[in-house]
Amino acid sequence: MLNNKTILITGGTGSFGKQFIKTILERYQDVKKIIIFSRDELKQFEIKQQYPHKDFPQLRFFIGDVRDRNRMIQACEGVDVIIHAAAIKQVDTAEYNPTECIRTNIDGAENVINAALQCGVKDVVALSTDKACAPINLYGATKLASDKLFAAANNIRGSKDIRFSVVRYGNVMGSRGSVIPFFMQKKEEGVLPITHEEMTRFNISLQDGVNMVM
């Protein structure tokens, strides 16, 4: 499926991105190129150290921000598949930085869509969250808006051979922003808070999340 393809992953230095890269390299030895797009120079450097160019020449690194439309277009040139994982996803961070959350999660999604349409990308998969269902916070609201943008993009593609998809996750264990580290910390303190006695959390592993996308 992904052999001989060029894949761009936004937010590629995050928890999902790193697991995705690892999985692709293990399963698809003939992948043409994996472009790791993120604004975190240090994390890109760390991935370069983990995967030296002489051993993994298919890896490419692109410093950029999904809020920058022109940079997004540059990154998408020659790309077959986009995995859109870039987001502001910490609930409290989104609440205290609403403008940045909207620019990243909504405007960024629109930039990815427009770049994909302009550059002839074939498949776009956007990562989302169950918090987008009947959202009660800004993070969930922005992801709902993002999801609708990606779904609507299938109606404006015209004759272009491109497909836009959205994958909604529950709590991804092992990812940044997961509630699991918080619970582990509270366990050490001897107190485990419960948001609501009837609350249900849906958990998947990081690898399960990657498998759903692939």
Model-derived features: positions:
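Rossmann-fold scaffold of SDR-type NAD(P)-dependent oxidoreductases
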Residues: T10, C76-A85, A126
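Conserved S-adenosyl-L-methionine
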Residues: T23-K33, G120
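Conserved glycine-rich Rossmann-like NAD(P)H-binding loop of the short-chain dehydrogenase/reductase
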Residues: Q29-K43
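Conserved Rossmann-fold cofactor-binding substructure of NAD(P)-dependent oxidoreductases
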Residues: R60-V81
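Conserved Rossmann-fold NAD(P)-dependent oxidoreductase catalytic core, especially the SDR/UDP-sugar
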Residues: H84, I88-K148, A152, F164
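NAD(P)-dependent short-chain dehydrogenase/reductase
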Residues: I136-Y139, L144-M214
